[in-house]
Amino acid sequence: MSTLNIQQLVTEFPLVEKLIALDDVSWFNPNITTLAEGLPYVGLDKTDIKDASDRLKRFAPYLAKAFPETAKTNGIIESDVVAIPAMKTVLEQQYHIAIQGTLLLKKDSHLPISGSIKARGGIYEVLTHAEKLAIQAGLLSESDDYSKLFTDEFRAFFKQFSIAVGSTGNLGMSIGIMSAKIGFSVSVHMSADARQWKKDKLRSHGVIVVEYKEDYGVAVAQGRKEAEKDPTCFFIDDENSPTLFLGYSVAGERLKSQFEAMNILVDELHPLFVYLPCGVGGGPGGVAFGLKMAFGDNVHCIFAEPTHSPCMLLGIHTGLHDEISVQDIGIDNITAADGLAVGRGSGFVGRAMERLLDGFYTISDERMYHHLGEMSKYEDIQLEPSALAGMLGPVVVSDNEEYLQRIQMDEQKLKNATHLVWATGGGMVPSEEMASYLAKSGI
Protein backbone atom coordinates (compact mmCIF):
# COMPACT_ATOMS: atom_id res chain seq x y z
CA MET A 1 0.00 0.00 0.00
CA SER A 2 1.38 3.42 -0.96
CA THR A 3 1.59 6.38 1.43
CA LEU A 4 -1.20 8.05 -0.52
CA ASN A 5 -3.42 5.03 -0.02
CA ILE A 6 -2.71 5.06 3.70
CA GLN A 7 -3.75 8.72 3.83
CA GLN A 8 -6.95 7.82 1.97
CA LEU A 9 -7.52 4.91 4.34
CA VAL A 10 -7.10 7.14 7.41
CA THR A 11 -9.50 9.71 5.91
CA GLU A 12 -12.10 7.02 5.28
CA PHE A 13 -11.42 5.10 8.52
CA PRO A 14 -10.13 7.51 11.23
CA LEU A 15 -9.70 4.56 13.62
CA VAL A 16 -6.72 3.41 11.51
CA GLU A 17 -4.77 6.47 12.71
CA LYS A 18 -5.17 5.25 16.30
CA LEU A 19 -4.04 1.76 15.27
CA ILE A 20 -0.93 3.28 13.64
CA ALA A 21 -0.26 5.20 16.87
CA LEU A 22 -0.45 1.84 18.75
CA ASP A 23 -3.21 3.20 21.00
CA ASP A 24 -5.53 0.85 22.87
CA VAL A 25 -8.66 1.07 20.72
CA SER A 26 -12.08 -0.56 20.61
CA TRP A 27 -14.55 -0.80 17.74
CA PHE A 28 -18.04 -2.21 18.01
CA ASN A 29 -19.30 -3.53 14.71
CA PRO A 30 -22.18 -1.45 13.27
CA ASN A 31 -22.75 -4.09 10.57
CA ILE A 32 -23.58 -6.95 12.94
CA THR A 33 -26.66 -8.96 11.95
CA THR A 34 -28.77 -11.67 13.50
CA LEU A 35 -27.51 -15.25 13.25
CA ALA A 36 -30.22 -15.99 10.67
CA GLU A 37 -28.97 -13.17 8.42
CA GLY A 38 -25.25 -13.78 8.95
CA LEU A 39 -25.13 -17.58 8.78
CA PRO A 40 -25.38 -17.97 4.97
CA TYR A 41 -22.09 -16.05 4.61
CA VAL A 42 -20.24 -18.60 6.75
CA GLY A 43 -20.91 -21.42 4.31
CA LEU A 44 -21.12 -23.96 7.15
CA ASP A 45 -23.95 -24.93 9.49
CA LYS A 46 -24.94 -27.14 12.42
CA THR A 47 -24.66 -30.34 10.35
CA ASP A 48 -20.97 -29.53 9.79
CA ILE A 49 -20.45 -29.02 13.52
CA LYS A 50 -22.24 -32.30 14.25
CA ASP A 51 -20.00 -34.06 11.74
CA ALA A 52 -16.93 -32.68 13.55
CA SER A 53 -18.34 -33.59 16.96
CA ASP A 54 -19.12 -37.15 15.81
CA ARG A 55 -15.60 -37.54 14.38
CA LEU A 56 -14.05 -36.49 17.70
CA LYS A 57 -16.27 -39.04 19.47
CA ARG A 58 -15.09 -41.77 17.07
CA PHE A 59 -11.48 -40.89 17.87
CA ALA A 60 -12.04 -40.68 21.65
CA PRO A 61 -11.07 -44.34 22.34
CA TYR A 62 -7.85 -43.80 20.36
CA LEU A 63 -7.02 -40.55 22.18
CA ALA A 64 -7.68 -42.13 25.59
CA LYS A 65 -5.08 -44.80 24.73
CA ALA A 66 -2.54 -42.60 22.96
CA PHE A 67 -2.66 -39.81 25.55
CA PRO A 68 -3.35 -41.24 29.02
CA GLU A 69 -3.99 -37.70 30.34
CA THR A 70 -7.27 -37.77 28.36
CA ALA A 71 -8.40 -41.12 29.82
CA LYS A 72 -10.32 -39.52 32.69
CA THR A 73 -12.53 -37.71 30.14
CA ASN A 74 -12.69 -40.86 27.98
CA GLY A 75 -10.63 -39.31 25.19
CA ILE A 76 -12.65 -36.09 24.93
CA ILE A 77 -10.35 -33.03 24.89
CA GLU A 78 -12.16 -30.36 26.89
CA SER A 79 -11.33 -27.64 29.42
CA ASP A 80 -12.89 -26.38 32.64
CA VAL A 81 -14.91 -23.22 33.17
CA VAL A 82 -14.07 -21.49 36.46
CA ALA A 83 -15.32 -18.39 38.25
CA ILE A 84 -12.68 -15.68 38.82
CA PRO A 85 -14.36 -13.32 41.33
CA ALA A 86 -11.08 -12.01 42.78
CA MET A 87 -9.95 -10.98 39.30
CA LYS A 88 -13.27 -9.22 38.74
CA THR A 89 -12.70 -7.14 41.88
CA VAL A 90 -9.13 -6.34 40.77
CA LEU A 91 -10.35 -5.17 37.34
CA GLU A 92 -13.10 -3.02 38.87
CA GLN A 93 -10.64 -1.33 41.24
CA GLN A 94 -7.93 -0.93 38.62
CA TYR A 95 -10.16 0.59 35.94
CA HIS A 96 -12.63 2.36 38.29
CA ILE A 97 -15.62 0.69 36.70
CA ALA A 98 -18.40 -1.64 37.84
CA ILE A 99 -18.56 -4.91 35.90
CA GLN A 100 -22.12 -6.19 36.21
CA GLY A 101 -22.78 -9.94 36.20
CA THR A 102 -20.41 -12.89 36.65
CA LEU A 103 -16.83 -13.21 35.40
CA LEU A 104 -15.68 -16.67 34.28
CA LEU A 105 -12.53 -18.11 32.69
CA LYS A 106 -12.48 -20.83 30.00
CA LYS A 107 -9.28 -22.74 30.64
CA ASP A 108 -8.26 -23.82 27.13
CA SER A 109 -4.86 -22.86 28.53
CA HIS A 110 -4.95 -26.20 30.32
CA LEU A 111 -6.33 -28.44 27.57
CA PRO A 112 -4.55 -31.80 27.50
CA ILE A 113 -1.96 -32.79 24.87
CA SER A 114 -0.77 -29.30 23.89
CA GLY A 115 -1.99 -26.84 26.55
CA SER A 116 -3.75 -24.35 24.31
CA ILE A 117 -6.91 -23.61 22.30
CA LYS A 118 -5.04 -25.05 19.29
CA ALA A 119 -5.59 -28.53 20.75
CA ARG A 120 -9.12 -28.14 19.38
CA GLY A 121 -8.57 -27.27 15.71
CA GLY A 122 -5.06 -28.61 15.20
CA ILE A 123 -5.68 -32.06 16.60
CA TYR A 124 -9.04 -32.26 14.83
CA GLU A 125 -7.54 -31.56 11.40
CA VAL A 126 -4.78 -34.16 11.88
CA LEU A 127 -7.37 -36.76 12.92
CA THR A 128 -9.63 -35.86 9.97
CA HIS A 129 -6.75 -36.38 7.54
CA ALA A 130 -5.70 -39.65 9.22
CA GLU A 131 -9.26 -40.99 9.08
CA LYS A 132 -9.58 -40.12 5.39
CA LEU A 133 -6.31 -41.87 4.49
CA ALA A 134 -7.11 -45.00 6.52
CA ILE A 135 -10.64 -45.29 5.08
CA GLN A 136 -9.37 -44.78 1.51
CA ALA A 137 -6.82 -47.55 2.08
CA GLY A 138 -9.56 -49.91 3.30
CA LEU A 139 -8.00 -50.13 6.78
CA LEU A 140 -10.77 -48.39 8.70
CA SER A 141 -14.52 -47.87 8.66
CA GLU A 142 -16.51 -45.39 10.72
CA SER A 143 -18.13 -48.18 12.73
CA ASP A 144 -14.74 -49.52 13.96
CA ASP A 145 -13.27 -49.05 17.41
CA TYR A 146 -10.70 -46.37 16.57
CA SER A 147 -8.39 -47.46 19.39
CA LYS A 148 -7.02 -49.91 16.82
CA LEU A 149 -5.18 -46.95 15.29
CA PHE A 150 -2.85 -47.08 18.29
CA THR A 151 -0.84 -49.98 16.86
CA ASP A 152 2.46 -50.42 15.02
CA GLU A 153 0.53 -51.48 11.90
CA PHE A 154 -1.22 -48.11 11.67
CA ARG A 155 1.88 -46.14 12.66
CA ALA A 156 3.74 -47.83 9.79
CA PHE A 157 0.89 -46.97 7.42
CA PHE A 158 0.83 -43.28 8.43
CA LYS A 159 4.65 -43.08 8.25
CA GLN A 160 4.31 -43.06 4.44
CA PHE A 161 2.67 -39.64 4.68
CA SER A 162 3.78 -36.30 6.01
CA ILE A 163 2.16 -33.17 7.41
CA ALA A 164 3.43 -29.59 7.35
CA VAL A 165 2.20 -26.44 9.09
CA GLY A 166 3.33 -22.85 9.66
CA SER A 167 2.91 -21.51 13.19
CA THR A 168 3.89 -18.93 15.80
CA GLY A 169 3.94 -21.77 18.31
CA ASN A 170 0.74 -23.25 19.70
CA LEU A 171 -0.79 -24.58 16.47
CA GLY A 172 2.57 -26.15 15.67
CA MET A 173 2.58 -27.77 19.11
CA SER A 174 -0.84 -29.37 18.71
CA ILE A 175 -0.31 -30.50 15.11
CA GLY A 176 3.27 -31.62 15.72
CA ILE A 177 2.53 -33.69 18.84
CA MET A 178 -0.64 -35.24 17.38
CA SER A 179 0.90 -36.02 13.97
CA ALA A 180 4.01 -37.60 15.49
CA LYS A 181 1.92 -39.71 17.87
CA ILE A 182 -0.30 -41.14 15.14
CA GLY A 183 2.74 -41.91 12.96
CA PHE A 184 3.03 -39.11 10.40
CA SER A 185 6.34 -37.53 9.53
CA VAL A 186 5.74 -33.89 10.47
CA SER A 187 7.48 -30.56 9.95
CA VAL A 188 6.52 -27.33 11.70
CA HIS A 189 7.63 -24.06 10.12
CA MET A 190 8.03 -21.61 12.99
CA SER A 191 8.18 -17.82 12.84
CA ALA A 192 10.67 -15.62 14.67
CA ASP A 193 8.17 -15.10 17.52
CA ALA A 194 8.02 -18.79 18.46
CA ARG A 195 9.29 -19.56 21.96
CA GLN A 196 12.37 -21.76 22.27
CA TRP A 197 10.69 -24.13 24.73
CA LYS A 198 7.95 -24.87 22.18
CA LYS A 199 10.57 -25.75 19.56
CA ASP A 200 12.41 -27.95 22.09
CA LYS A 201 9.21 -29.75 23.08
CA LEU A 202 8.33 -30.47 19.45
CA ARG A 203 11.81 -31.81 18.72
CA SER A 204 11.54 -34.09 21.76
CA HIS A 205 8.48 -35.64 20.06
CA GLY A 206 10.45 -36.28 16.85
CA VAL A 207 9.02 -33.29 14.97
CA ILE A 208 11.14 -31.48 12.35
CA VAL A 209 11.20 -27.80 13.32
CA VAL A 210 12.14 -25.31 10.60
CA GLU A 211 12.99 -21.88 12.03
CA TYR A 212 12.58 -18.50 10.32
CA LYS A 213 13.87 -15.05 11.18
CA GLU A 214 10.71 -13.56 9.66
CA ASP A 215 7.13 -13.44 10.93
CA TYR A 216 4.19 -15.82 10.76
CA GLY A 217 3.20 -15.01 7.16
CA VAL A 218 6.63 -16.07 5.85
CA ALA A 219 6.63 -19.30 7.89
CA VAL A 220 3.21 -20.25 6.49
CA ALA A 221 4.19 -19.40 2.90
CA GLN A 222 7.41 -21.45 3.13
CA GLY A 223 5.59 -24.37 4.73
CA ARG A 224 3.06 -24.31 1.92
CA LYS A 225 5.82 -24.17 -0.71
CA GLU A 226 7.70 -27.14 0.80
CA ALA A 227 4.51 -29.21 0.97
CA GLU A 228 3.72 -28.55 -2.70
CA LYS A 229 6.93 -30.36 -3.70
CA ASP A 230 5.81 -33.60 -2.02
CA PRO A 231 2.61 -35.35 -3.17
CA THR A 232 2.44 -37.34 0.10
CA CYS A 233 2.60 -34.16 2.20
CA PHE A 234 -0.57 -32.54 3.55
CA PHE A 235 -0.28 -28.84 4.40
CA ILE A 236 -2.52 -27.60 7.21
CA ASP A 237 -3.42 -24.06 6.25
CA ASP A 238 -4.14 -21.96 9.33
CA GLU A 239 -5.18 -19.04 7.12
CA ASN A 240 -7.85 -20.80 5.06
CA SER A 241 -8.87 -24.12 6.61
CA PRO A 242 -12.59 -24.86 7.13
CA THR A 243 -11.52 -28.13 8.82
CA LEU A 244 -9.52 -26.33 11.52
CA PHE A 245 -12.41 -23.88 11.89
CA LEU A 246 -14.86 -26.74 12.50
CA GLY A 247 -12.55 -28.35 15.05
CA TYR A 248 -12.77 -25.15 17.08
CA SER A 249 -16.53 -24.80 16.54
CA VAL A 250 -17.37 -27.91 18.60
CA ALA A 251 -16.49 -25.79 21.66
CA GLY A 252 -19.90 -24.09 21.41
CA GLU A 253 -22.07 -27.13 22.14
CA ARG A 254 -19.56 -28.30 24.76
CA LEU A 255 -19.77 -24.96 26.58
CA LYS A 256 -23.56 -25.09 26.43
CA SER A 257 -23.49 -28.47 28.21
CA GLN A 258 -21.03 -27.14 30.80
CA PHE A 259 -23.26 -24.13 31.47
CA GLU A 260 -26.30 -26.39 31.87
CA ALA A 261 -24.39 -28.47 34.44
CA MET A 262 -23.41 -25.24 36.25
CA ASN A 263 -26.98 -23.86 36.11
CA ILE A 264 -25.85 -20.87 34.07
CA LEU A 265 -28.68 -19.51 31.98
CA VAL A 266 -28.11 -17.87 28.60
CA ASP A 267 -31.15 -16.27 26.96
CA GLU A 268 -32.39 -12.82 25.95
CA LEU A 269 -32.55 -11.69 29.58
CA HIS A 270 -29.27 -13.43 30.54
CA PRO A 271 -26.72 -12.43 27.87
CA LEU A 272 -23.31 -14.02 27.39
CA PHE A 273 -20.24 -11.95 26.45
CA VAL A 274 -17.20 -13.91 25.29
CA TYR A 275 -13.73 -12.39 24.90
CA LEU A 276 -11.46 -14.25 22.48
CA PRO A 277 -7.77 -13.50 21.81
CA CYS A 278 -7.21 -13.33 18.05
CA GLY A 279 -4.15 -14.05 15.91
CA VAL A 280 -4.85 -15.12 12.32
CA GLY A 281 -8.48 -15.71 13.34
CA GLY A 282 -9.12 -19.44 12.87
CA GLY A 283 -9.34 -20.33 16.57
CA PRO A 284 -11.52 -17.45 17.77
CA GLY A 285 -13.49 -17.47 14.51
CA GLY A 286 -14.32 -21.15 14.79
CA VAL A 287 -15.16 -20.89 18.50
CA ALA A 288 -17.34 -17.82 17.84
CA PHE A 289 -19.18 -19.69 15.08
CA GLY A 290 -19.80 -22.61 17.44
CA LEU A 291 -20.98 -20.24 20.18
CA LYS A 292 -23.39 -18.52 17.79
CA MET A 293 -24.79 -21.90 16.73
CA ALA A 294 -25.20 -22.91 20.39
CA PHE A 295 -26.53 -19.67 21.90
CA GLY A 296 -27.83 -17.72 18.88
CA ASP A 297 -28.18 -13.96 19.22
CA ASN A 298 -27.82 -14.14 23.02
CA VAL A 299 -24.03 -14.50 22.79
CA HIS A 300 -21.83 -11.53 21.97
CA CYS A 301 -18.33 -12.40 20.71
CA ILE A 302 -15.54 -9.85 20.98
CA PHE A 303 -12.01 -10.36 19.62
CA ALA A 304 -8.91 -9.06 21.42
CA GLU A 305 -5.63 -8.34 19.61
CA PRO A 306 -2.24 -6.88 20.59
CA THR A 307 -1.72 -3.20 19.73
CA HIS A 308 1.22 -4.34 17.57
CA SER A 309 -0.77 -7.02 15.66
CA PRO A 310 -4.36 -5.82 15.10
CA CYS A 311 -4.77 -7.74 11.83
CA MET A 312 -8.40 -8.90 12.11
CA LEU A 313 -9.67 -5.54 13.39
CA LEU A 314 -7.85 -3.81 10.52
CA GLY A 315 -9.15 -6.26 7.90
CA ILE A 316 -12.80 -6.28 8.99
CA HIS A 317 -13.02 -2.57 9.87
CA THR A 318 -11.71 -1.49 6.45
CA GLY A 319 -13.40 -4.34 4.55
CA LEU A 320 -10.02 -5.19 2.99
CA HIS A 321 -9.64 -8.45 4.95
CA ASP A 322 -6.46 -10.29 3.86
CA GLU A 323 -5.68 -7.65 1.24
CA ILE A 324 -4.11 -5.51 3.97
CA SER A 325 -1.54 -6.28 6.66
CA VAL A 326 -0.53 -4.34 9.77
CA GLN A 327 2.89 -3.87 8.17
CA ASP A 328 1.18 -2.00 5.30
CA ILE A 329 0.23 0.73 7.77
CA GLY A 330 3.64 0.77 9.46
CA ILE A 331 2.94 -1.49 12.46
CA ASP A 332 5.78 -3.91 13.28
CA ASN A 333 3.82 -7.05 14.34
CA ILE A 334 6.20 -7.59 17.26
CA THR A 335 4.48 -8.57 20.51
CA ALA A 336 5.11 -10.63 23.64
CA ALA A 337 1.80 -12.35 22.82
CA ASP A 338 3.57 -14.76 20.46
CA GLY A 339 0.38 -16.68 19.68
CA LEU A 340 -1.22 -13.48 18.37
CA ALA A 341 1.76 -12.12 16.39
CA VAL A 342 0.05 -12.19 13.01
CA GLY A 343 0.19 -9.32 10.53
CA ARG A 344 -2.46 -10.44 8.05
CA GLY A 345 -5.77 -11.92 9.17
CA SER A 346 -7.51 -14.89 7.56
CA GLY A 347 -9.65 -13.71 4.65
CA PHE A 348 -11.77 -16.83 5.00
CA VAL A 349 -12.57 -16.14 8.67
CA GLY A 350 -12.98 -12.38 8.21
CA ARG A 351 -15.46 -12.71 5.36
CA ALA A 352 -17.31 -15.61 7.02
CA MET A 353 -17.70 -14.01 10.44
CA GLU A 354 -17.72 -10.22 9.94
CA ARG A 355 -21.51 -10.01 10.41
CA LEU A 356 -21.53 -12.17 13.55
CA LEU A 357 -18.84 -10.49 15.66
CA ASP A 358 -19.88 -7.74 18.06
CA GLY A 359 -16.56 -6.00 18.28
CA PHE A 360 -12.81 -5.79 18.62
CA TYR A 361 -10.30 -4.11 20.88
CA THR A 362 -6.53 -3.90 21.16
CA ILE A 363 -4.40 -4.33 24.27
CA SER A 364 -0.75 -3.49 24.96
CA ASP A 365 1.87 -6.06 25.97
CA GLU A 366 2.28 -4.18 29.27
CA ARG A 367 -1.39 -4.70 30.15
CA MET A 368 -1.26 -8.37 29.19
CA TYR A 369 1.77 -8.91 31.44
CA HIS A 370 0.11 -6.96 34.26
CA HIS A 371 -3.05 -9.09 34.07
CA LEU A 372 -0.88 -12.23 33.86
CA GLY A 373 0.66 -11.32 37.21
CA GLU A 374 -2.73 -10.51 38.72
CA MET A 375 -4.22 -13.84 37.59
CA SER A 376 -1.34 -15.70 39.18
CA LYS A 377 -1.47 -13.70 42.42
CA TYR A 378 -5.23 -13.45 42.97
CA GLU A 379 -6.58 -16.59 41.27
CA ASP A 380 -3.47 -18.85 41.30
CA ILE A 381 -3.91 -19.50 37.56
CA GLN A 382 -0.79 -19.27 35.40
CA LEU A 383 -1.26 -18.24 31.76
CA GLU A 384 0.94 -17.10 28.87
CA PRO A 385 0.70 -13.43 27.73
CA SER A 386 -1.57 -14.15 24.72
CA ALA A 387 -4.17 -15.72 27.01
CA LEU A 388 -4.61 -12.44 28.91
CA ALA A 389 -5.70 -10.44 25.84
CA GLY A 390 -9.33 -11.24 26.69
CA MET A 391 -9.08 -10.04 30.29
CA LEU A 392 -9.67 -6.40 29.40
CA GLY A 393 -12.91 -7.29 27.56
CA PRO A 394 -15.40 -6.89 30.42
CA VAL A 395 -13.93 -3.44 31.13
CA VAL A 396 -14.13 -2.37 27.46
CA VAL A 397 -17.76 -3.54 27.19
CA SER A 398 -18.86 -2.08 30.53
CA ASP A 399 -17.35 1.26 29.55
CA ASN A 400 -19.10 1.56 26.16
CA GLU A 401 -22.54 3.02 26.75
CA GLU A 402 -23.23 3.53 23.04
CA TYR A 403 -22.66 -0.16 22.25
CA LEU A 404 -24.73 -1.35 25.21
CA GLN A 405 -27.63 0.88 24.18
CA ARG A 406 -27.39 -0.26 20.57
CA ILE A 407 -27.79 -3.91 21.59
CA GLN A 408 -30.56 -2.90 24.04
CA MET A 409 -28.64 -4.02 27.10
CA ASP A 410 -30.47 -2.53 30.09
CA GLU A 411 -29.35 -2.56 33.73
CA GLN A 412 -31.22 -5.76 34.57
CA LYS A 413 -29.79 -7.71 31.63
CA LEU A 414 -26.28 -6.53 32.55
CA LYS A 415 -26.80 -7.70 36.14
CA ASN A 416 -27.78 -11.13 34.74
CA ALA A 417 -24.87 -11.23 32.26
CA THR A 418 -22.08 -13.78 32.11
CA HIS A 419 -18.65 -12.55 30.97
CA LEU A 420 -16.39 -15.37 29.75
CA VAL A 421 -12.69 -14.72 29.11
CA TRP A 422 -11.24 -17.41 26.83
CA ALA A 423 -7.76 -18.27 28.13
CA THR A 424 -5.96 -19.61 25.09
CA GLY A 425 -2.66 -20.99 26.40
CA GLY A 426 -0.14 -21.34 29.19
CA GLY A 427 -0.74 -24.70 30.84
CA MET A 428 2.49 -26.21 29.51
CA VAL A 429 4.80 -23.20 29.95
CA PRO A 430 7.99 -24.36 31.77
CA SER A 431 8.38 -22.96 35.29
CA GLU A 432 11.47 -20.87 34.46
CA GLU A 433 9.64 -19.28 31.50
CA MET A 434 6.63 -18.57 33.71
CA ALA A 435 8.93 -16.99 36.31
CA SER A 436 10.23 -14.58 33.65
CA TYR A 437 6.64 -13.70 32.64
CA LEU A 438 5.74 -13.03 36.27
CA ALA A 439 8.87 -10.89 36.73
CA LYS A 440 7.76 -8.73 33.79
CA SER A 441 4.26 -8.33 35.21
CA GLY A 442 5.32 -5.92 37.93
CA ILE A 443 2.97 -7.65 40.38
From Swiss-Prot:
Coiled-coil annotated spans: none
Gene Ontology MF term list: D-serine ammonia-lyase activity; hydro-lyase activity; pyridoxal phosphate binding
EC id: 4.3.1.18
Modified residues (N6-(pyridoxal phosphate)lysine): K118
GO process terms (BP): D-serine catabolic process; isoleucine biosynthetic process
Catalytic activity, as annotated: D-serine = pyruvate + NH4(+)
Cofactor(s) it depends on: pyridoxal 5'-phosphate
Keyword Lyase annotated: yes
One Pfam family per UniProt: PALP
Assigned keywords, A-Z: Lyase, Pyridoxal phosphate
This protein's record includes keyword Metal-binding: no
Family recorded in the similarity comment: Belongs to the serine/threonine dehydratase family. DsdA subfamily.
NCBIfam families: D_Ser_am_lyase, PRK02991.1
The name this protein goes by in its record: Probable D-serine dehydratase
Species, as recorded: Photobacterium profundum (strain SS9)
Record gene name: dsdA
